[in-house]
Amino acid sequence: MEHTIAVIPGSFDPITYGHLDIIERSTDRFDEIHVCVLKNSKKEGTFSLEERMDLIEQSVKHLPNVKVHQFSGLLVDYCEQVGAKTIIRGLRAVSDFEYELRLTSMNKKLNNEIETLYMMSSTNYSFISSSIVKEVAAYRADISEFVPPYVEKALKKKFK
C-alpha cells in the first residue's frame, strides 16, 4: 500500500485546540502529516515564525506521525517536495468555505494531482480562531479551554 502524506497548512498564530482537533483527527487517516507553517504576507504575526513552530511542535509531540515545517511560496510546490497528494483544511462555518473554495480552485489549476480534503471542526471548537483567542488573552481572560497549556503560557507572556 502506498505511503500517504497530507499537508495541513496555516499561519497558526497561535495554534488552538481547533487546529489540534483537525491535526489529531487526520493522523489516523494518513501515514504522515506535515503541519506547514506558511509565512503569510497578508498577516502580521503576533508570534514570530520560530515561535509558532515551537508552539506547534510542543502541541503535537504526542503525535509520532506529525512533522512541523515552515514554508514560503506556493503550497502546491511544498506538497510536491514532500510527496503529499492531499491538503487538509479545517472549516468552522460556511463563510470559511467560500474563501477555501477559491484557494482550492487555484491549487487545482497549479497542480491537478493534489486534492483538498475539508474537515469540519468539532462543534465545541467551531467558534475558535487564533484572532479571537488573542483578543481574549489581551484582556487577561481565561483561555485554557481554547489553547494547549504551553500556548496559554506563551500568550500570557506576550500580553503582560
Curated annotation (Swiss-Prot):
One of its GO terms (molecular function) is pantetheine-phosphate adenylyltransferase activity. ATP binds at residues 11-12, 19, 90-92, 100, 121, 125-131. It is an enzyme of class 2 (transferase). It catalyses: (R)-4'-phosphopantetheine + ATP + H(+) = 3'-dephospho-CoA + diphosphate. Substrate binds at S11, K43, L75, R89. Pathway: Cofactor biosynthesis; coenzyme A biosynthesis; CoA from (R)-pantothenate: step 4/5. Keywords: ATP-binding, Coenzyme A biosynthesis, Cytoplasm, Magnesium, Nucleotide-binding, Nucleotidyltransferase, Transferase. Its EC number is 2.7.7.3. Pfam families: CTP_transf_like. Its cofactor is Mg(2+). Belongs to the bacterial CoaD family. Homohexamer. PANTHER family: PHOSPHOPANTETHEINE ADENYLYLTRANSFERASE. This is Phosphopantetheine adenylyltransferase. The gene is coaD.
